[in-house]
Structure formats: C-alpha cells, structure tokens
From Swiss-Prot:
Residues 2-24 form a propeptide. It comes from the Eukaryota. GO terms for molecular function: ion channel regulator activity; toxin activity. Expressed by the venom duct. Disulfide bonds join 25-40, 32-44, 39-49. The presence of a 'disulfide through disulfide knot' structurally defines this protein as a knottin. The cysteine framework is VI/VII (C-C-CC-C-C). It is found in: Secreted. One of its GO terms (cellular component) is extracellular region. Its main location: secreted. Keywords: Disulfide bond, Ion channel impairing toxin, Knottin, Neurotoxin, Secreted, Signal, Toxin. Belongs to the conotoxin O1 superfamily. It comes from Conus bullatus. This is Conotoxin Bu13.
Amino acid sequence: AEDSRGTQLHRALRKTTKLSLSIRCKGPGASCIRIAYNCCKYSCRNGKCS
C-alpha cells in the first residue's frame, strides 16, 4: 500500500510542478524560489530571476 501511495504522490507532484511552470512562471528580475523553478527560461539567483 505504501508503494502505490508514494507513486500517486509523485504523480501529483509532477503534475503541479508542470502547472506552476507554465502558469505562474516569472520574467527576469522577479522574485523567485530556487527550488520552485518558477522563472520562465531564467535561473533563480539571489532570490531573483536572471
């Protein structure tokens, strides 16, 4: 049971990651969280997309 639950969680996580990437991505100079990858085509440096 634990195995399938982990897989479901992983799937849901991947889905929300894709959604946040396409919908809530930010342009250069916007504040960002490195682990959230929420910059469009930019990398997160010092809390800002650059």
